[in-house]
Amino acid sequence: MSILAAERQQRILERLGRDGRVLAASLAEAFATSEDTIRRDLRDLAGRGLCRRVYGGALPVSPASSSAQIRAGEATDRKAALGQALAGLITPDSLLFMDSGSTNLAAVKAFPDDLRLTVATHDPAIAAALLAKRQVTLWLIGGRVDARIGAALGGRTLADIEALRPELALLGVCALDPVAGVAAFDPEDAEIKRALLRNSSRVAAAILNEKLETSAPFVIGQAESLDYVILEADASDSVARAFADRGTTVLRAQPAEAD
């Protein structure tokens, strides 16, 4: 790699960190070079895990590729606020599907103790937390449990989920962008999430700021396939408008009050 190319790629990364996305055409104009050269730069950066290529440019890589155990201990107060907002969408006496994810686990803690509900999940940690909710009827979807995802995956799991018609699905999201859509890091996890999009009357996803305007390898659906997106209180207004322009209802989680 020439010094010029190395410097250009560093500046591309700086723009990506500042703006949340880069477009090949704009970069070519800014650096007075060809789009082919920029595309080669983006391929090289993506190959080193420094960005994720999308049509026309690149997005940052989502930070959500760590294990379920690690994710459960991160940003707990912020996830609690998102979980509270998710819990407010639930219709009593309905079928709710809870996808895997530490933010969805936080939502369980926000359920009122007297909430009457049937909940299906393939996430053992969520199922264990639901046992404390005496008015909840729990359906645990089985299959091979993937330790990194923290949930059952595979053909048996998918078949059982395909047979359900939830009134609401709380989707666990690895990466979300208004243009690039919803994405995941595991192909089997992505297939389960696609089934939830197809079969649920309503779908909601709550997302931390650092997962916004990022991408992951396996596309689940377009942003407009989500009925609700719950953002943090300080999430970008422009991102919120971009989701709303696509017909998605945008809610903001209220931060937890300090003791």
Residue map of PLM features:
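HTH-adjacent hinge/linker in prokaryotic transcriptional regulators
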Residues: 1-102, 108-116, 120, 131-135
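Conserved phosphate- and dinucleotide-binding cores of soluble alpha/beta proteins
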Residues: 2-27, 32, 47, 125-259
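A generic "binding-loop/recognition-motif" signal
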Residues: 102-103, 126
